[in-house]
Amino acid sequence: MENQEADTPITESLSDTPEAECVRQLVGRRHWMKLGIWGALGTIGGGLGYMMAPPAVLPLYFNGLYAFAHESHPPVIHQLVAAANELVGKPYKWGGGHRVLFDNGFDCSGSVSHVLYRAQLLDRPLSSSAFARYAWPGPGCYVTLFVNPGHHVFMQICGLRFDTSGTVTGEGPRWRVASRSYAGFYPRHPAWL
């Protein structure tokens, strides 16, 4: 006769207490603990073999015009934010930022290229089509580029959107708090970010 208790998921075998509810929530979240190569090495060394997922990322400070990274953010986030802040107030210019790093206006891909270049995450400007192959697919922990190949690209840094498209046609690169449609966009992210 088989042991039925061995086949019962831990979340079903817990009593109804506040502590049990906490365990149910933690076990139910797949991202809470991940078994990785370092976790496997930890098991060999006598550890549990699990690594905690990174903590929730703190949002950027935003004063309505400029963004500021928190002191706990990695240095590269500070570089990205500083580079993006330099472009705030520049006008939209089709093709801007592709031939000259410090142009007098920027389009969507030119502004994203400039920000990534200044943080040493890109070695040359890319078009929105080329960004479809940039770095890694999927959203990043700190930085996510949203690419609609051949049409538009924008980025989010710690949840704050840096984009050339907003409520007024012809606005250049700005930090945006208003939501926008993500239909047709594919997320990409720089490695480790």
Language model regions located:
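N-terminal secretory signal peptides
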Residues: 1-31, 38-46
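C-terminal segment of N-terminal export signals and the immediately downstream linker at the start
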Residues: 26-30, 46-75
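Short linear capping/connector segments at secondary-structure termini
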Residues: 63-66, 95-100, 130-133
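...with weaker cross-activation on analogous glycine-rich loops/strands in unrelated enzymes
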Residues: 70-73, 81, 113-193
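Solvent-exposed, acidic/flexible segments
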Residues: 70-77, 101-109
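Solvent-exposed, polar/charged alpha-helical surfaces in well-ordered, non-transmembrane soluble domains
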Residues: 78, 82-86, 109-114
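Active-site nucleophile-His-acid catalytic modules used for acyl/amide transfer and hydrolysis
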Residues: 86-105, 119
